């Protein structure tokens, strides 16, 4: 069998069109959704990510502003800028692009963002709310994956799910959202003794470690759904994921490609989180 492709670009297009309609309705009431993105330093990958986020805002009727600072920016000055944005009624979402220069404590920076504007969902208050099943914001990448499952009618209740990776950005929140949906969840990581023993039992596999070919065809149960969150480069410099796509697609039931899978969904869910923040602010006004 050859797996059915879960097309992140196509789903993103649909969700962004819906978000643009809701944004237009809010704007008509004087509450245009606004996102502020802060970039410190000149990391080329970060510059691309920020550019894509700003463009997504512009294309869908959101207000956006980009604050760019040199790598020498002090932690105190960055925290002061975040405080200003916290108090700015035009801004409903604040995103600080990671990684930050070594002299800036990223944990302190994330905690400085007002929880109600933390559209990445990284603040400890939002992480805690996710743990209790009542999140204000769901982290964008796992949220996007959940939308993919829903769009393709992939059953999660009672399913065996394996998440490979335990980061605060993807692995842990992904496991929490799957658990919330009724799946039986196993988290695997670099210290897991026999990864294949876990993945071969899984109906759902989410690979999110940033290691090429960590999941191969012999590790996948026929018909399983495989979500590839990884972003790596192959020997030719071509973008690839964590999954051996060519092999696994012949075994899996559903699979996401890289590029064109989870990546577009991450920015789409950032828009939706910002939109939901703006809707809450408008309701409270």
UniProtKB/Swiss-Prot annotation:
Q: Which InterPro entries match?
A: Aminoacid_DH-like_N_sf (IPR046346), NAD(P)-bd_dom_sf (IPR036291), THF_DH/CycHdrlase (IPR000672), THF_DH/CycHdrlase_cat_dom (IPR020630), THF_DH/CycHdrlase_CS (IPR020867), THF_DH/CycHdrlase_NAD-bd_dom (IPR020631)
Stored SUPFAM superfamilies: Aminoacid dehydrogenase-like, N-terminal domain, NAD(P)-binding Rossmann-fold domains
Reactions mediated catalytically:
(6R)-5,10-methylene-5,6,7,8-tetrahydrofolate + NADP(+) = (6R)-5,10-methenyltetrahydrofolate + NADPH; (6R)-5,10-methenyltetrahydrofolate + H2O = (6R)-10-formyltetrahydrofolate + H(+)
The terms describing its cellular component in GO are:
cytosol
Pathway assigned in UniProt: One-carbon metabolism; tetrahydrofolate interconversion
Q: What is its EC number?
A: 1.5.1.5, 3.5.4.9
Family matches, as PANTHER family: C-1-TETRAHYDROFOLATE SYNTHASE, CYTOPLASMIC, C-1-TETRAHYDROFOLATE SYNTHASE, CYTOPLASMIC-RELATED
Name of this protein:
Bifunctional protein FolD
Question: What organism is listed for this UniProt entry?
Answer: Burkholderia multivorans (strain ATCC 17616 / 249)
The encoding gene: folD
């Amino acid at each position: 069998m050859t797996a059915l492709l879960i097309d992140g670009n196509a789903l993103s297009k649909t969700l962004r069109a819906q978000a643009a309609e809701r944004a237009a309705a809010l704007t008509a009431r004087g509450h245009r959704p606004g996102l502020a993105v802060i970039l410190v330093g000149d990391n080329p990958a970060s510059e691309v990510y920020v550019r894509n986020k700003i463009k997504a805002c512009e294309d869908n009727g959101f207000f956006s502003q980009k604050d760019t600072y040199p790598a020498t920016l002090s932690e105190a000055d960055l925290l002061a800028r975040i405080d200003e944005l916290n108090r700015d009624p035009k801004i409903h979402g604040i995103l600080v692009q990671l990684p930050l220069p070594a002299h800036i404590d990223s944990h302190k920076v994330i905690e400085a963002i007002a929880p109600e504007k933390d559209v990445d969902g990284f603040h400890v208050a939002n992480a805690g709310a996710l743990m209790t099943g009542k999140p204000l914001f769901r982290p964008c990448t796992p949220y996007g994956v959940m939308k993919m499952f829903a769009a393709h009618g992939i059953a999660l209740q009672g399913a065996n799910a394996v998440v490979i990776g335990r980061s605060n950005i993807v692995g842990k929140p992904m496991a929490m959202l799957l658990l919330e949906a009724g799946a039986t969840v196993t988290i695997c990581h670099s210290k897991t003794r026999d990864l294949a023993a876990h993945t071969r039992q899984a109906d759902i596999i989410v690979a999110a470690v940033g290691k090429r070919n960590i999941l191969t065809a012999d590790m996948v149960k026929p018909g399983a759904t495989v979500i590839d969150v990884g972003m790596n480069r192959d020997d030719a410099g071509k973008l690839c994921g964590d999954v051996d796509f060519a092999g696994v697609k012949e075994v899996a039931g559903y699979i996401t490609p890289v590029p064109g899978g989870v990546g577009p969904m991450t920015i789409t869910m950032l828009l939706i989180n910002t939109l939901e923040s703006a809707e809450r602010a408008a309701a409270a006004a």
